[in-house]
């Protein structure tokens, strides 16, 4: 068990835990310094060494992200707003976005409902021409020929309208689907990009809503 920590050391430890849980990797010294307002990474290094001496973390020499939590299996909620706001500041400082990763969507509930969000993923701002609001885990191969494969993460920007030909996330009744939007003579079609799947024609009896437009794609291999 770690020795008693100072308030500042606890704040840094909470930040490390939150960063690891949301992005899968620890912050660098420079990121900690920017997030918590230190003058230099050396100040962060001093606090990290103190945390290591007290048994809260282990440090790997020569590695910028060489921080390992000693209680990695323990889930500890972050302290008041400090760690969460610091993490958001860190993401801005290093040009990264923290996006909610949406998995399976339950019938009838909002796509960003808490129970749908598997975790948050840190991604490079420069990956996208437009800033996405969330990542949707792709299920199925109906958009294969557009290069969107099972397990990929589709970057989605919330939108209630879309142009013809755009790839959209649409809610049709109780189902959420990724398809190419086509409007023709007042009729809406959701087109797959795989000849093994049939177009979906939206008729007036079905509840239809756009949940967003696709603004980018992340291959799942890129996260490992």
Swiss-Prot record:
Q: List the GO molecular function terms.
A: DNA binding; serine-type endopeptidase activity
Output the GO biological process annotations, alphabetical, semicolon-separated.
DNA repair; DNA replication; negative regulation of DNA-templated transcription; proteolysis; SOS response
At which residues is the DNA-binding region annotated?
Answer: 29-49
Domain of life, source organism: Bacteria
Which residue windows are transmembrane per the record? none
Keyword Lipid biosynthesis in annotation: no
Q: Which residues form the active site?
A: 142, 179
Identify the residue position(s) of the site Cleavage: 107-108
Which chemical reaction does it catalyze? Hydrolysis of Ala-|-Gly bond in repressor LexA
Checking SUPFAM superfamilies in the record gives: LexA/Signal peptidase, Winged helix' DNA-binding domain
Q: Does the keyword Coiled coil apply?
A: no
What keywords tag this UniProt record? Autocatalytic cleavage, DNA damage, DNA repair, DNA replication, DNA-binding, Hydrolase, Repressor, SOS response, Transcription, Transcription regulation
InterPro entries the UniProt entry points to: LexA, LexA-like, LexA/Signal_pep-like_sf, LexA_DNA-bd_dom, LexA_repressor, Peptidase_S24_LexA, Peptidase_S24_S26A/B/C, WH-like_DNA-bd_sf
Q: What is its EC number?
A: 3.4.21.88
Instruction: State the family named in the UniProt similarity comment for this chain.
Output: Belongs to the peptidase S24 family.
Which PANTHER family does this one have? LEXA REPRESSOR, LEXA REPRESSOR-RELATED
Protein role: Represses a number of genes involved in the response to DNA damage (SOS response), including recA and lexA. In the presence of single-stranded DNA, RecA interacts with LexA causing an autocatalytic cleavage which disrupts the DNA-binding part of LexA, leading to derepression of the SOS regulon and eventually DNA repair.
Its assembly, as annotated, is: Homodimer.
Protein name according to UniProt: LexA repressor
Annotated source species? Bordetella petrii (strain ATCC BAA-461 / DSM 12804 / CCUG 43448)
Source gene?
lexA
């Amino acid at each position: 068990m770690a020795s008693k920590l100072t308030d500042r050391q606890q704040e840094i430890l909470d930040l490390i835990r939150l960063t690891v849980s949301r992005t899968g990797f620890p912050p660098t010294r420079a990121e900690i310094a920017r997030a918590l307002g230190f003058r230099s990474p050396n100040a962060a290094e001093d606090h990290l060494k103190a945390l290591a001496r007290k048994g809260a973390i282990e440090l790997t020499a020569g590695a910028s992200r060489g921080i390992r939590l000693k209680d990695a299996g323990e889930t500890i909620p972050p302290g008041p707003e400090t760690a969460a706001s610091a993490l958001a500041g860190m993401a801005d400082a290093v040009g990264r976005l923290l996006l909610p990763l949406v998995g399976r969507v339950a019938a009838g509930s909002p796509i960003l409902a808490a129970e749908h969000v598997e975790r948050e993923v840190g991604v490079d701002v420069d990956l996208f021409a437009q800033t996405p609001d969330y990542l949707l885990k792709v299920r199925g191969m109906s958009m294969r020929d557009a290069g969107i494969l099972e397990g990929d993460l589709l970057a989605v920007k919330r939108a209630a309208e879309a142009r013809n030909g755009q790839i959209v996330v649409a809610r049709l009744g109780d189902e959420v689907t990724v398809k190419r939007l086509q409007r023709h003579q007042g009729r809406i079609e959701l087109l797959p990009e795989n000849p093994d799947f049939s177009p979906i024609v939206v008729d007036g009896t079905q509840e239809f809503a756009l949940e967003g437009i696709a603004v980018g794609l992340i291959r799942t291999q890129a996260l490992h």
